[in-house]
Amino acid sequence: MRLEIKDLHVHYGKIEAIKGVSVVVNEGEIVTLIGANGAGKTTMLKTISGLRPVTSGQILFNGEDISKMPAHKRADLGLAQAPEGRGIFVGMSVLENLEMGKYNRKDRKKEMAEDLEKVYHLFPRLKERAFQAGGTLSGGEQQMLAIGRALMSRPKVLLLDEPSMGLAPLMIQNIFNIITEINKTGVTILLVEQNAQQALQRAHRAYVLEVGHVVKEAKAQDLLNDPAVRAAYLGTGAH
């Protein structure tokens, strides 16, 4: 299942936020987009998932142009997003939040129960707190819930927007371990992340965005060792 973005342009009113970006995510990969605030990373994910309109360019999902397709149709094809800010329903229980993730599913209760157990296996804390309101969870637990809800739709490609935002270092490590585990089950991942160190350590390939442009693309390990990337995004110079 290949996701390909070709020469994408996206506007907010008269302001061009994405300026001719091309990105490829091959089946089975973790690909990360890194860059400073305002680089266009979140806009990219919103546009891919159908929450922002395309000005020009193409979004191809397994060869099919989905650029004009409504968000729910894209979800039916196998795109799922865990958004920035998590977007959980604070007044609903953990279980109810997870059940919201399967709104596009038409399979039997047995299969849905199996998927719920898979989510609980990845995130045991969610099982412990199944009947707690989402709003009572810690930031890390809410992030687990957002990812778990996205997984309930059985995605082929998972879009993750800033999963480490606002989390303590130990929880960040935990979340990235789980992202790696999800990928090993066969889910392709496009990851937007300001924690460039963790993102580049986990990804197969990476793109660097600056003010709506791709300025670098390479294997993640190569970017991790790139002196310019280290100085700009990892807080270190060349060694």
Regions found by a protein language model. Name each.
Residues 1-239:
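Glycine-rich phosphate-binding loops of nucleotide-dependent enzymes
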